[in-house]
Every structure is written in C-alpha cells, then in structure tokens.
UniProtKB/Swiss-Prot annotation:
It is a multi-pass membrane protein. This is Probable sugar efflux transporter. Gene3D superfamilies: MFS general substrate transporter like domains (1.20.1250.20). GO terms for cellular component: plasma membrane. CDD domains: MFS_NepI_like. It is found in: Cell inner membrane. GO terms for molecular function: carbohydrate transmembrane transporter activity. It comes from Escherichia coli O157:H7. Residues 36-49, 102, 157-169, 230-245, 296-298, 354-363 are periplasmic. The gene is sotB. Involved in the efflux of sugars. The physiological role may be the reduction of the intracellular concentration of toxic sugars or sugar metabolites.
Length: 396
C-alpha cells in the first residue's frame, strides 16, 4: 500500500516538474512580447523592427520541429530532455550577454531549437508518467503550466525587464531552467522512446482529412491572434496612450483569463469541444474587431483582454486535444507537426503585425487580425459539421 502511494506521489511529481518545464518554455517564447520596447531602446531600433525576432523564433520552431523529432525518435527521452535543457540554458546565457541585436537573434534561434524538440515530446511523456487513470489530469497540468506562462511568466518577465533590464529577464529564465533540469535529472527514470512514429507515419497522418483540417484551422486562428497580440505592449503605450504599468497589468489580466478558459474547457470539453472551439473563435473575432475602439478606456481594454484570454486558452486546448485524439498511434509526430504549424501561425501573425505597424499604422492590427479570424470561424463550422463524430469520439 505504501509503495503504491509513494509511486503515485513520484508519478505526480514527475508530471508537475514537466509542467514547470512547460511554464519555462512558454514563458521564454511569450516574454519578448512584453519587452519589445525595452529591447528596441537598448539597440536604438524601432519596436516594429525588433518584432521580427518573434517571427524568426516561431518559424525556426516550425521548420525544425519535425526534422528534430525524427532525428531523435530513437533517443532515450531522459537523455534527450537533459540535452535540450543544456542548449536552452546556454542560449539564455548568450541572450543575457548579447552585445548586438544579431547576437540576440542567434541566441533565440538556439532556444527555438530546444523548443522544437521539447513540445513534440512533452504531451506524450506526461501521459506516460501519469498515475494510472490520470492521463487527462496530467495533460491538464501541462496546459496549466502553459497558462501560467501567460498569467505569471510574461508579466513577471516584463516587470523584471522594467526594473532590472530585459537581459536579466532572460538570465532569470535560464536560472529557472537550470533548477528544473536538476529536478528532472533527480526524478525521471529511463524513458525509452515509445509511439514516436517515423517518416512512415507521415503519409498515414496526411491521409486523415480531419487531422489536416485541424492543422489548417490552427495556423489560421493563431495567425489572427498573433497579428494583434505580438504588438499589444507598444499598442497599449503608443496607440492607447496608457502607462507601461498598465501594459503590464493588461498582460497579467489577459493571461489570467486563460485559467478561466482552462476551467471552462475542463468541465465542458469532453462533450462540447467543437462547439466550444467555434464559440471561442467567434469571441476572438469580436475582441480583435473591438481592440481599437476599446483603446479609449482602460476599463474597456481590461474587459476585452479577459474575453480574449478565455478565447485563446479554449482554442489552444481544443486544438491539442483533437490532435492527440486523431493520432494516438504517432503522438510525437503529430504533436511535432502541431507545434510546427502553431509556430507558423505565430510567425505569420507577428510578421503581419510587423508589416502593418511599419507600413500602415499599429492602430490597425486588430482590424487586420479579424480577416484570418473570420476565415477560421467559417472553417471551424465547416469541419466540425463534416466530422462531428471523428473529432469528438476518438478519445473514447
């Protein structure tokens, strides 16, 4: 009896440590959103010019997720996690030391390499290490780590950047990663590769129209979100005319609302996943359309950010759950593709926001984001009517 209790505790401790790792990886991806103005000032650049760093990072992840996953498909997972954390930590040290914007971008590419592998294996590892009958809760913990990156990681990173300089933000993330690495070394057993798939899995996955439709929906809706979200910090300060402290509070509010979205999806996702995702996309569309009109009031922007955060968390969870349900025989390949496609959307959205800000007006980022958001809404309605059972019932 005691052995079972201890083993369950250890199993949960392993999953929690993975969730902390997810928090750290997501924090470092999102945190530049809150530091763009400071980094731009440091290198005497325009904020929109620095924003291209977001696109480069995201597209490196998109490009390398599948190749790296296939290259490491037979590598024992504990060893793989240790190696990618070493690369992650070293890259953050370089970010801290970066003496030019080019060096900063190079350091971020190193982080992106580690990111590409991490997110292709994390969901399946959490499921493997979860106590018996607790797979859904394990995935929920990983999702919570992701949500907390928005709730705590991004705002805390911005606060550290405001008071101690943006370099210290990256250094602090590196220290957090080092502590997490030591915990992983202590806790994780040997984890031989399982269900990782191979190149042979790709034609099989590509022949699943429901899965391909989810991938397409993902890239379009993420593009819509990041067209505006990538530049929300300079938008709040330069377009709305509010303080840097309010920009920090708004990021905290938007991220915190994601936890509400996670709770809603946790309660209703099993029965109404498709309806929830479509409703969330419609809510995102409304938020983007109202971004500029809401910029005349801190209260209006605050309320809008709550609904925006709820919508994006439901969308993100819904997409991940459906991908895992539609590819149980090749989870690592499917999640590597998902991570790559998600990051194509991040990069595309950041690039669109960059071009709108440079060549038109940053005030228009919300309106421009409504175009892919509307397309995503129509596509979600079409595919969820076309495959209502396939998407909902394969988890049973």
């Amino acid at each position: 009896m005691t052995t079972n209790t201890v083993s369950r505790k250890v199993a949960w401790l392993r999953v929690v440590t993975l969730a902390v790792a997810a928090f750290i990886f997501n924090t470092t991806e999102f945190v530049p959103v809150g530091l763009l103005s400071d980094i731009a000032q440091s290198f005497h650049m325009q904020t929109a010019q620095v924003g291209i760093m977001l696109t480069i990072y995201a597209w490196v992840v998109a490009l390398m997720s599948l190749p790296f996953m296939l290259m490491t498909s037979q590598v024992e997972r504990r060893k793989l996690l240790i190696c990618l954390f070493v690369v992650f930590i070293a890259s953050h040290v370089l970010s801290f030391l970066s003496w030019s914007f080019t060096v900063l971008v190079i350091s971020r590419i190193g982080v992106a390499f580690a990111h590409a592998i991490f997110w292709s294996i994390t969901a399946s590892l959490a499921i493997r290490m979860a106590p018996a009958g607790k797979r859904a809760q394990a995935l929920s913990l990983i999702a919570t780590g992701t949500a907390l990156a928005m709730v705590l990681g991004l705002p805390l990173g911005r606060i550290v950047g405001q008071y101690f300089g943006w370099r210290m933000t990256f250094f602090a993330i590196g220290i957090g990663a080092l502590i997490t690495l030591l915990c992983l070394i202590k806790l994780l057993p040997l984890l031989p590769s399982e269900h990782s798939g191979s190149l042979k899995s790709l034609p099989l996955l590509f022949r699943r129209p429901a899965l391909m439709s989810i991938y397409l929906l993902t890239v379009v809706v993420v593009t819509a979100h990041y067209t505006a979200y990538s530049y929300i910090e300079p938008f709040v300060q330069n377009i709305a005319g509010f303080s840097a402290n309010f920009a920090t509070a708004l990021l905290l509010l938007l991220g915190g609302a994601g936890i509400i979205g996670s709770v809603i999806f946790g309660k209703l996702g099993n029965q109404y996943a498709s309806a929830l995702v479509s409703t969330a996309i419609a809510l995102l569309l409304v938020c983007l359309a109202l971004l500029l009109p809401a910029a005349n009031s801190e209260i209006h922007l605050g309320v809008l950010s709550i609904f925006w955060g709820i919508a994006m968390m439901i969308i993100g969870l819904g997409m991940q759950v459906k991908v895992l349900a539609l590819a149980p025989d090749a989870t690592d390949v499917a999640m590597a593709l998902f991570s790559g496609i998600f990051n194509i959307g991040i990069g595309a959205g950041a690039l669109v926001g960059n071009q709108v800000s440079l060549h038109w007006s940053m005030s228009m980022i919300g309106y421009v984001g409504t175009v892919p958001a509307f397309a995503a809404l129509i596509w979600s309605i079409i595919i969820f009517r076309r495959w209502p059972v396939t998407l909902e019932e394969q988890t049973q």
